[in-house]
């Protein structure tokens, strides 16, 4: 009687990854970074999509990414007065527009193939300036972004981790958050307990309470949280992202990882 041998094959499942928090910028615009320092290589060198995709070729497969603003230079007062203080952030939105439509300037390090990877992006916004100014800014941001990139705006960010106490609790800030909720846009919140202390966490909790107070559930702003919590010699970083939401994907992606505590950290 002949024997048969059945070979078993192991199929490695694919786990497509969406990188929910990346920062990139072209060399031609590093001078607009608010944290630019000629002695800091991170702010003087270009960080392009060509470099990013080259570094993400190994499994699991990269399905796409969400781009977050890189803290371009801005001024709230002149922005509120005539929009001139928004030049840096709007320049960044125009760069993302070029990524979305596959029209890079020479040397920017991206091409048409990168457009499909852009799942969403989170520009800067002048939250402390209040709802009326925020409405003007969002309209201008969408105008600069154009149709293709504009539909990929998933939320906005205003860095509070280096701001004085009370910033998150200002009337204008809270009204700006409520506007984002009405517009179905998220707010990206960076809390730096590592450098700032416990008060940032406490103020963030109060901020969420005020932003949701008296607001229907359907219009409550969704908060995307990135936290930096101190550990000896290491920094615990946890991000909870709800930027990329589709019918066939869970509503939250979470990230938890350890980094050696840096002496300087970019946004």
Model-derived features with residue positions:
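Acidic (Asp/Glu)-rich catalytic clusters
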Residues: 52-61, 95-116, 136-153, 171-182, ...
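An N-terminally biased module of ancient metal coordination in phosphate/nucleic-acid-related enzymes
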Residues: 2-109
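Catalytic metal-binding/acid-base residues of hydrolase active sites
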Residues: 23, 71, 159-161, 192, ...
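Long, hydrophobic, well-ordered secondary-structure blocks that form the structural core
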Residues: 118-133, 154-164, 176
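Structural preference for beta-strand elements that scaffold enzyme active sites
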Residues: 16-19, 64-67, 116-122, 152-157, ...
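Catalytic pocket-lining loop regions of alpha/beta-barrel enzymes
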Residues: 169-267
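A structural signal for the main folded, soluble domain(s) of proteins
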Residues: 14, 21, 65, 121, ...
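Acidic-and-aromatic substrate-binding clefts and catalytic sites of carbohydrate-active enzymes
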Residues: 42-43, 74-75, 85-89, 125-136, ...
């Amino acid at each position: 009687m002949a024997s048969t041998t059945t070979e078993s094959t192991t199929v490695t499942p694919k786990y497509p990854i969406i990188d929910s928090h990346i920062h990139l910028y072209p060399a031609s615009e590093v001078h607009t970074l608010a944290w630019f320092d000629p002695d800091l290589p991170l702010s003087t060198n270009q960080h392009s999509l060509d470099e990013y995709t080259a570094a993400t070729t190994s499994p699991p497969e990269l399905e796409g990414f969400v781009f977050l603003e890189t803290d371009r230079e801005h001024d709230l007062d002149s922005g509120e007065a005539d929009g001139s203080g928004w030049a840096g952030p709007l320049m960044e939105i125009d760069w993302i527009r070029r990524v979305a439509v596959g029209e890079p300037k020479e040397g920017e390090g991206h091409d048409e193939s990168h457009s499909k990877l852009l799942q969403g992006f989170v520009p800067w916004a002048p939250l402390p300036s209040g709802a009326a100014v925020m409405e003007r800014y969002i309209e201008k941001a969408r105008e600069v972004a154009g149709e293709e990139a504009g539909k990929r705006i998933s939320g906005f960010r205003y860095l509070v981790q280096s701001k004085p106490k009370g910033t998150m609790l200002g009337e204008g800030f809270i009204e700006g958050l409520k506007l984002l909720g009405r517009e179905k846009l998220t707010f990206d919140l960076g809390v730096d307990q590592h450098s700032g202390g416990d008060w940032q966490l406490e103020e963030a909790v109060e901020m969420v309470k005020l932003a949701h107070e008296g607001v229907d559930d359907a219009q409550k702003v969704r908060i995307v949280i990135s936290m930096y919590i101190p550990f000896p010699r290491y920094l615990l970083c946890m991000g909870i992202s709800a930027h990329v939401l589709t019918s066939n994907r869970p509503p939250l992606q979470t990230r938890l990882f350890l980094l050696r505590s840096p002496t300087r950290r970019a946004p």
